[in-house]
Structure formats: structure tokens, C-alpha cells
Design a protein with these regions (language model features):
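Short, low-complexity, intrinsically disordered N-terminal peptides in bacterial proteins
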Residues: 1-29, 131-135, 275-278
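Ferredoxin-reductase
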Residues: 13-114
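FNR/FR-type flavoprotein reductase catalytic core
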Residues: 102-240
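Local cysteine-cluster metal-coordination motifs and their immediate loop/turn environment
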Residues: 149, 216-217, 238-267
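Short, basic/aromatic-enriched C-terminal tail that caps enzymatic domains
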Residues: 198, 259-278
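Nucleotide-activated chemistry modules centered on ATP-dependent adenylation/adenylyltransferase
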Residues: 219, 225, 245, 269-278
């Protein structure tokens, strides 16, 4: 994007959702204290006892303190954005990772005793359900590694219908992270044979309020279904981010009211604000 283009984009963004504290708690070096696997997913536990409690749906920027080659100046250079999946009583933060490239490969290889650089919590999380009347019925919809923000949100809500979609049985091992969830797999190897949105449609009755995170095609299907049934929905969008606090404009997405940066105005957006996802 040209300098003039960035200036115009910055002008269109200014004031859209109010001012932000860009990096409210600073970057800090923290130890990895837990690691477990669920199929292709790695759940990494990071000790952050003095850090602020994240809101469900917020994220953090993570990078291995020691990169490939053993030095702090080795590749990969940039951190990666991950939803906070869970916060334990001792301040431990859990993150759900999947090895899909150099940055996540390095993070997935970390073990207890290694350190990470963490910046967060960042962004806007899920807004609580409308208290009614009528009482709202939360429905959580996740796809793949998009289960992460639904874990902490499910913990906070306590009582919600959770629907999870995965590629196959190996990936569906991640469903164990949200007990009681109903599962759909593309190949029919676990649960419903088909898309998770096929499980969602019957749930869109009176009082339903949807919260979703997953790949763009899934989120677009959720958005369209909820619009068709006049059901409110909040979508946690995924995007590559270089900074996490609004400086790089790498996570800009269009809405009905103009462009927003997912790292400061999201990653959770009202579905009604989006004409389309992806």
C-alpha cells in the first residue's frame, strides 16, 4: 500500500470505535509451563501470574524467546497472534497452536522450561449475551483451531450449546478441549457427516445468540445463516498480524461502515456489521 493509501486508510479508521491503549501491558518474557497435544493441536501453557485477566475473545502476540539457531535475532522475526484459550486460577494462559508454517512450527516445538515473548491481552473480545427478556441462549460455533476463544468463553458462560467442525477424526481430537460439544467432520469419521453449519441451522430459534470462530468460509456461512434467521451473532475473525496493536495495517477488513483493524477493533465483530466474511 502506498504512503497516500495508508494515510487515507488511517483517516477512514480514525474514530470508528474510539481511541485505544495500543500496548496496555507491554511485552514480557514468560516461561512455558505446560504442553499437551490433541491430534494435530498443541496446547501451550504459559505462566503469567502477574498479567491481567483477558476477556474471552482477546488475543496475544507470541514468539519463541530463542528462535532457530538459538539466538534472539534468528528467524522467524515476527510474533504470531493467538486467541487466549483459557486462563487458570494461577494465572497460566493456554494457547491452542497448529503447525502451519515457520512461526507456528517453532512455537509448537517449545517445551516446559522454554520461554516466550508475549504481548497482550489485546483487542476486543466477545460481548456478553443480552440479558433479555427474553433470556438469550448462547450457541458457540468453532472450526479447527478456531475452538480456542470458545474454550475461555464456554468457561465464562457455564451453560451454552457448543458445535465444533473438523476435517477428520485426527483433528476432532480437539473437541476434548470443550467437554459436551457436538462435533461434525467433513469425512464423517466422527459425529455428524458434513459441515458444522448443518448442526447450527436447527439451533437458530427464538433467543439464540451465536458466537463463532473459524476459517472464513465457515464464518461466512454462519453470518449468512444468522442474517437469514434474524439471530444476533458475534464473529471472531482470523488474520495474520505483524504488530497486534494497530500500527502495521496488516489486518484491515471492510465493514458496512468502513475499514477496521482486527487487532484493535476486533478480532470479534458483530456479524451485522459485515456484508461478507473473506
Amino acid at each position: 500500500m502506498s504512503g497516500a493509501g495508508k494515510h487515507a486508510l488511517a483517516s477512514s479508521l480514525r474514530g470508528t470505535r474510539g481511541d485505544r491503549t495500543l500496548a496496555p501491558f507491554g511485552r514480557r518474557r514468560l516461561p512455558v509451563v505446560a504442553r499437551e497435544t490433541h491430534g494435530p493441536y498443541v496446547v501451550l501453557g504459559v505462566a503469567d501470574p502477574d498479567g491481567p485477566a483477558p476477556d474471552p475473545g482477546q488475543f496475544a502476540m507470541l514468539a519463541a524467546a530463542e528462535r532457530w539457531g538459538g539466538g534472539e535475532d534468528e528467524r522467524p522475526f515476527l510474533p504470531r497472534a493467538f486467541s487466549v484459550a483459557r486462563r487458570h486460577g494461577d494465572g497460566r494462559l493456554d494457547f491452542v497452536l497448529e503447525d502451519v508454517g515457520p512461526g507456528t512450527e517453532r512455537l509448537c516445538a517449545l517445551e516446559p522450561g522454554d520461554d516466550v515473548w508475549l504481548l497482550g491481552p489485546l483487542g476486543r473480545g466477545f460481548a456478553p449475551p443480552d440479558p433479555g427478556p427474553p433470556a438469550r441462549r448462547p450457541v458457540l460455533v468453532g472450526g479447527g483451531v478456531g475452538i480456542a476463544p470458545l474454550m475461555i468463553w464456554s468457561d465464562a458462560l457455564g451453560d451454552a450449546t457448543t458445535l465444533l467442525g473438523f476435517r477428520d477424526a485426527a483433528h476432532a481430537a480437539g473437541a476434548a478441549l470443550i467437554p459436551g460439544a457436538r462435533v461434525a467432520t467433513d469425512d464423517g469419521s466422527v459425529g455428524h457427516h458434513g459441515l458444522v453449519t448443518e448442526l447450527l441451522a436447527p439451533e437458530l430459534g427464538p433467543g439464540a445468540e451465536v458466537y463463532a470462530c473459524g476459517p472464513p468460509p465457515m464464518l461466512e456461512a454462519v453470518r449468512a445463516l444468522c442474517a437469514e434467521h434474524d439471530v444476533p451473532a458475534q464473529l471472531a475473525l482470523e488474520s495474520g498480524m505483524a504488530c497486534g496493536f494497530g500500527a502495521c495495517f496488516g489486518c484491515v477488513v471492510p465493514t458496512r461502515d468502513g475499514y477496521v483493524r482486527l487487532c484493535v477493533d476486533g478480532p470479534v465483530l458483530d456479524a451485522a456489521a459485515l456484508a461478507e466474511v473473506g
